[in-house]
Regions:
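Active-site catalytic loop in hydrolytic enzyme cores
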Residues: 88-196, 264, 268-270
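Extreme N-terminal starter segment of soluble prokaryotic enzymes
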Residues: 1-4
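Short beta-strand scaffold segments in enzyme catalytic cores
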Residues: 82-84, 96-99, 135, 233-235, ...
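Short polar catalytic/cofactor-binding loops
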Residues: 7-12
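A conserved C-terminal secondary-structure "cap"
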Residues: 262-289
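Short, acidic/polar
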Residues: 16-26, 154-159
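Cys-nucleophile CN-hydrolase/nitrilase-fold catalytic domain and related Cys-dependent amidase chemistry
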Residues: 14-15, 23-102, 109, 175-206
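CN hydrolase (nitrilase-like) catalytic-core segments centered on the catalytic cysteine
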Residues: 61-81, 143, 152-252
Length: 289
């Protein structure tokens, strides 16, 4: 199965950014991709660099966004993984991945469970933690374990998705560096980000697709300069081997995912078989003290 990750920068406004994204979706579809993944919050800038109530306005188009991306998926006959700002009601918002099937129907959605609150990533101000659990989304091309960005640092999320039958793990993402970070620190952060996700592929015997954004986005509050989103979107197989990896520029990243490889890998590395589920109760504690 041919898959595509669309790694884009923000073009200063939603209209232009979406227009550029639509062009790439059409290109990817024409190139034979059956599954297309977009980055986290792909319609707008990464507004979570500061706490500003005016940014909640981005969520006002939630229902229209659903209809719009549904038509995009249908027009291009692709399974489309989007990342949208969900307005559930006034004062209650989610960072939500919505998956559309090839006929435009909503196959399912996932509300981001792990919400960061770090300098430049003030997501707790905007997003309520997800309440839909870790549920794979059934589509015409298989069961997709869709998670979002900060979720990628948690092996528990990947494991539960796998135990519930996910055939792919997918991470729409927005992550990058600050200018004050040293070259060595930037290298460490990027390598850690790639390593943790490849480890999810290995530990669970499933392919991983991680789609990040690129470009520099200023901090609108002026407290910090802004974030250089590092891109490096990638696709790896069930043994963590890289099938394709992007750099720091805009691109459409393609790979062919062989889902039969999951069975082959799990037969020689039966990690699920050897789990000692009778000994894991301490995982339900915040800390063992």
């Amino acid at each position: 199965m041919k898959v595509a990750l669309i790694q884009k920068k923000y073009y200063g406004n939603t209209k232009k950014t979406v227009k550029k994204t639509l062009i790439d979706i059409e290109i990817a579809s024409d190139s034979g991709a059956e599954l297309i993944v977009l980055q986290e919050l792909h319609q707008s800038e990464y507004f979570c660099q500061s706490e500003d109530v005016t940014f909640f306005a981005y969520a006002n188009s939630w229902e229209k966004d659903i209809l719009f991306w549904s038509e995009v998926a249908k027009k291009n006959s692709v399974v489309l993984v989007t990342s949208l700002f969900e307005k559930r009601t006034a004062g209650l918002y989610h960072n939500t991945a919505v998956v559309f099937d090839k006929d435009g129907t909503v196959a399912g959605k996932y509300r981001k469970m792990h919400i960061p609150d770090d300098p430049g990533f003030y997501e707790k101000f905007y997003f309520t933690p997800g309440d839909l659990g870790f549920e794979p989304i059934e589509t015409s091309i298989g069961k997709l374990g869709v998670l979002v960005c900060w979720d990628q640092w948690y092996p528990e999320a990947a494991r539960i998705m796998t135990l519930k039958g996910a055939e792919l793990l997918i991470y729409p993402t927005a992550i990058g560096w600050f200018d004050e970070d040293s070259k060595k620190e930037k290298k460490r952060q990027l390598e850690s980000w790639i390593t943790i996700q490849r480890s999810h592929a290995i530990a669970n015997g499933v392919p991983v697709l991680s789609c990040n954004r690129v470009g520099f986005e200023k901090d609108s509050s002026g407290v910090m300069d802004g974030i250089h989103f590092w891109g490096n979107s990638f696709i790896c197989d069930p043994q963590g081997s890289l099938l394709a990896q992007a750099g720091e520029e805009e691109t459409i990243l393609y790979a062919t995912v062989d889902r039969e490889r999951t069975k082959e890998v799990r037969d020689i590395w039966p990690f699920l078989r050897d789990r000692r589920i009778d000994t894991y109760k301490d995982l339900l504690k915040r800390y063992c003290d």
